[in-house]
Amino acid sequence: MKMACFFRSTAPRRKYPWGAAVIFFCLQAATASSEPVTLIFAGDLMLADGPGKTITAGGDPLAHFAAILDFADYRIANLEVPIATGGRPHASKIATFRADPQVVPVLHRRFDAVSLANNHSGDYGHEAFGETMRHLSNAGIAYFGGGRNLAEAHRPLWIDKNGLKIAVLGYNEFKPRAFEAGANWPGVAWSEDDLVIADIRAAKSAGADLVIPFMHWGWEKETRPSERQKTFARRMIDEGAALVVGSHPHVTQGAEIYKGKPIIYSLGNFVFDGFDYPEARRGWLLRLKLDKSGVLFWETLAAEIDDAGTPWPASGAFTPCGRGSEELVLECRNP
C-alpha cells in the first residue's frame, strides 16, 4: 500500500464554533495506477504589460510558485490574453490585451493547459485568436473553452492520469455576449445553460470519471458570488460535475460545499497588473487531490500580486480548504 499524508493547520473564521486545529490527511492507494491525481487551477493569467515586460527582460513572473506548480500532475489556468503579433484591437473595448509570443516558453514551463473561455480572448479579433491557438499547439500547451468552431470550443480538455479520466470544460459568461464560436467560425464557448449541461452529460457518457466546469463568470470587484452563480453551480453538480471552479471578477469569491462537492466561485487574479484596489492583488491557486470517488482534499493557496503583476506566496495566510465529501469549508494556514 502507498500512502500520502498532509498536515494542515486550520483556523476557522469566528462564525464557526470550533477553534484552531491541525488536520492530518492520509490518502491510500492500493496500486500505482490508483494513486490520487494532483490537479492545480490558477485564475487569470494576463501576460502582456507588466508581466510581459518581466518575461521579455528574461524573468519569469511564475517563478515564486515554481515548486508548487512543478509538484502537480497537471496544471490549468485561465489565459486572459491573446498571444499574437497580428490583429487589431477591438474598437469598442476600454481594455485590450495582447501578449508577445516570447511569453510562450514561460507559459509552457508552468502550465499544461489553458482555458480560452474569457472576455479577452477576442481583444485583437479572429486573426490574433487563431494565432494564439497555433502558438499554444506548437508549444504543446492544450487549450479548451475556445476553438475554430462551436464543436471545438465545447470540446473537453481530457486528462488521463493514474487511471483517472478527467474532463474539464470551459465557458465564458461575461456580458455583453461576444466573440462566441459558431458552427463555422472561431470563438469561445458561451455559458448557455442547456449546452453546458449537455456537455457535462456527454463527457460522462464518453467515459469521464470526473467532470470539472471552469467558469468565467460573476461581477467584477464583487467578493461574493451572485445568486446566478450559486444556482447554476449547484445545478452543474446535480447534473454530474465533481466540482466547479470559477474566475473573472478579479477578486476571490469564497467557496462552499454542495452535496459533498466543492464550489470555488472565483480564484481571482494570478498574474495581472494595473489594479488599484487591494482585493484584486490577492488571488488563489487551487490544489486538488482527486481519485475516481471525487475530491479527496482541496486547498486554496494565496498569492500576493506586486506592482509588476508577479504573484508571491502569502505564507501564513488562512484560505478555504476541505476534505473529502465533508459538508464543511475549513480555513487552512498556507505553508
Each language-model region and where it sits:
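N-terminal secretory targeting signals
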Residues: F6, A30-S34
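Bacterial N-terminal signal peptides
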Residues: G19-Q28
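Acidic, metal/ion-coordinating pockets
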Residues: S33-P335
